[in-house]
A protein has these predicted regions:
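A short glycine-threonine-serine/GTX helix/turn-capping micro-motif
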Residues: 15-22
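C-terminal cap/loop subdomain of S1 sulfatases and analogous C-terminal strand-loop tails that border
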Residues: 9, 14, 26-29, 34-102, ...
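Membrane-interface catalytic loops of GT-C/OST-like multi-pass glycosylation enzymes that act
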Residues: 1
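Active-site neighborhoods of enzymes that stabilize oxyanions during catalysis
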Residues: 4
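Intrinsically disordered, low-complexity polar regions and short flexible loop motifs
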Residues: 109
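Long, internal low-complexity/basic segments
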Residues: 73, 116-151
Length: 151
């Protein structure tokens, strides 16, 4: 279950606000740089989340979570290498080199107790989330600057 509050104290704006937007740790650096009026460096990932909070709009439909375990857990033969996609409605998780995964309908199962990954009724949802996860992985990959000249 991933539901972690993030508290931001802003000396430029002391009025309390809250948001249910999907935020990530990759959003912290762009937010700090924006607040300090510093141009972000080439290839920075994430977005300035204060704009979303001030406008009361969500800036992303889903969010990828990466996890690389450093120990072998029960049921695994090596440390887990995991990618999850969280949306308002679903959480979808894949484990590297494993046949199983996780799919939870957060609207009907907010405590994530009924894994729907192998449920045939959710196969189209699983396919859609798989594609979105791949797109998130491509979006968050490090990018090199484009060359200014070609030889």
């Amino acid at each position: 279950i991933t539901n972690v509050p993030f508290i931001w104290s802003d000396p430029q704006n002391r009025s309390p606000k809250s948001s249910d937007s999907l935020l990530s740790t990759i959003d912290i650096a762009p937010t700090i740089l924006s607040r300090a009026n510093v141009k972000p460096y080439w290839g920075i990932q994430g977005v300035d989340f204060l704009q979303s909070i001030e406008r009361k709009t969500s800036f992303r439909e889903d969010l990828m979570i990466e996890f690389h375990d450093n120990i072998v857990r029960f049921g695994f033969d090596k440390p887990a290498f995991v990618r999850s996609l969280i949306s308002e409605r679903y959480r979808f998780t894949l484990y590297k080199d494993q046949e199983f995964g996780e799919l939870y309908d957060l609207e009907n199962d907010p405590n994530e107790t009924f894994n729907l990954y192998d449920n045939k009724n959710y196969s189209s949802v699983r396919s859609m989330l798989y594609k979105k996860l791949v797109n998130q992985m491509m979006e968050n990959i490090d990018k090199s600057p484009a060359p200014k000249r070609l030889a």
